[in-house]
Amino acid sequence: MSTTTVNLATGRQLRAARVLAGLTQRTLGAALGVDERAVRFWERKHDRKPTGSPNDRRIEQCLLEHGVILFAEPTAGARLAEKR
């Protein structure tokens, strides 16, 4: 079992991060191996946790690969990763 902290906290945060990464619901869904309707469903959760832990980790990793970092504290948000 992984002890990795998951920073995905709300559907709004997911939508903001996806847009910041330049992804559509369709492209994020394809990258995660789910239908775009699943992404749309998760984003509609607004101020609630959008999905379960296994998906949270996959979503967070996918967004990181597209240059976006999620954070949960002090409030849920997303930012562009620094270029190396």
Regions found by a protein language model. Name each.
Residues 33-51:
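Recognition helix of helix-turn-helix/homeodomain-like DNA-binding domains
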Residues 14, 28-29, 39-42:
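Conserved hydrophobic/aromatic packing and binding residues within compact polymer-binding modules
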Residues 53-71:
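DNA major-groove recognition helix of helix-turn-helix/homeodomain DNA-binding modules
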Residues 13-27, 83:
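Short basic helix-loop element that most often maps to the first helix and adjoining turn
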Residues 2, 68-84:
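Helix-turn-helix/homeodomain-like alpha-helical modules used for DNA recognition
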Residues 9, 20, 31, 54, ...:
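Cell-envelope/extracellular anchoring and linker segments
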Residues 1-19:
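A short, Lys/Arg-rich alpha-helix, primarily the initiator
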